[in-house]
Amino acid sequence: MCAAAAAESQHPQGADAGSRVVAYVQGGSIPAVIHPGKLTHINFSFAHITAGRALLDQPGVADDLAKLRALKKQNPKLKVIVSVGGWLADGFSDAALTDSSRRAFARSAIVLLREYTLDGIDLDWEYPGQGVAGIKYRAEDKENFTLLLKTLREELDAESDARGRAGSDRYILTIAAADREYFDHVEMSKLHVYVDWINEMAYDFFNSLTSTTGHQAGLYPSQFSAATDRNGDAAVKQYLAAGVPTAKIVLGVPFYGRGFAGVTPQNNGIKQPYEHYEGDHSYDELVGKYIGKQGFVRYWDEQAQAPYLWNSASRTFISYDDPQSIANKVCYVRERHLGGMMFWDLGSDRDDELLNAIARGCSR
């Protein structure tokens, strides 16, 4: 282990930090056409944890990753990262529990990098110290998550040194992270020094677990917001207050919408009780079946900088992001000198309508 292995990650990876465009892509649903020139990083989702080790053993993984690596022929600066975990993914608490378990997990991640010729590791632990997804958790996850990232940083830096990967080619370590109570269960002011950046999931603010409809990815509060409602700007400020450098905050946007049915028919369905969660819809599905179709009307909340759909006949409300809201977020990222943008996921926008809104940059 080199003496500097545990040092803070001082080198935000990729193209210049403010221009990162990080795409999550799901194994088994790689789009037939990908324009790699619009991306800086692809996070392949997901590796899982079995017996404390990170594994990629799903059918078709090797072919999927070969397709993604082949994109480097068109964009040599593109980085392909493996994301470990995801919603409902268990195993993190045990993997992070002891020094030996952390070391074993980190070394298993190195094995994946070698086997599939990858450029880094992303951890999507949803969530340390919380059992909302039905996963195993412990109170000590809070400290252990920091220690796990420290161990991963050590192992990745040692592997970079051993392979002569320098500068922007050093192995990358990132996490996907949330806001509000998430901060109660992690040591954000400590852990950020070990990662190259944080993929801030600035979405899912309203979902199947919330009691009312609302903007699932609103950038700001609006007249319809309660004081306790979440929004992207408040989330960014929470990271900044914890001492996270602006260049390490990558703002996440959803390429899907969330639908609510049986909604109380007031205020065009926004911030209203609902009878049941109707489901998730990819942006492609929204364009093909919902926006301006079947009685759905698009509305724009100027204060929140967010669109939504309302069908008064079926009493269905859908919150989503579109090119207008994403373009505003691109400007938000630029004006605040954040580290770039991330989205979930590439397969939900096969005509690149949303990705193009990111690629065009800020026009104001």
Please annotate each region the language model reported.
Residues 18-19, 38-40, 76-80, 117-121, ...:
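Short, well-ordered coil/turn segments that N-cap beta-strands
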Residues 11-113, 130, 140, 149-151, ...:
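Glycan-recognition patch characteristic of GH18 chitinases/ENGases
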Residues 114, 124-157, 161-179, 314-364:
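Active-site and adjacent substrate-binding regions of carbohydrate-active enzymes
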Residues 44-47, 70-73, 110-118, 153-161, ...:
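Sec-exported extracytoplasmic/periplasmic mature domains
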Residues 84, 206-217, 253-332, 358-364:
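Glycan-binding loop/region signatures in secreted carbohydrate-active enzymes
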Residues 22, 51-62, 128-288:
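Substrate-binding surface in catalytic domains of secreted glycosidases
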